[in-house]
Amino acid sequence: PLNIGGIQGVCIFTGLPVPEIAKGAFGLERHEQEGLFELSRLCIRPDTQQTEYNITSWFVARCIKRLRRETKVRAIISYADSDYHNGTIYRACNFRYCGLSDRKKDFYFADGTKHSRGSIKGEEGEWRDRTQKHRYVMVFDKSLDLLWSDKSSVLSSD
């Protein structure tokens, strides 16, 4: 955590949530995914962002440096929700932009709740488009072959 007179921000790295991400990004099988991380949560207090110039990129860079010091990091993947932003902070931290995630749909029951898992046969509801995410990757292991193409030139600013 970022602690300047109290916690100002948090950056959380997790293992990849599903093995298919590493398969799509690097062609890696389930048993080859050690050292791959997702920057899954990043939060900085808004008042801190307004008073401290470049605090978010500074903080993310320090967190990545610490993670690499404490464990083997081959690559970090992160996503920016296209409904809210396009990932300016990741570009500022030298992540490579790799386009949008695949289009997907989720099933919503008639009462408006989202279906999580299992069969929906015979259920009333509708399929809704899921928001696509901007994909960002930072590769440290030069032996990894990034299969997602670099799309930096096609991304407009926030």
Which residues make up each language-model segment?
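Conserved beta-hairpin
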Residues: P1-V18
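Acyl-donor binding region in acyl/amide transferases
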Residues: T14-R128, R135-M138
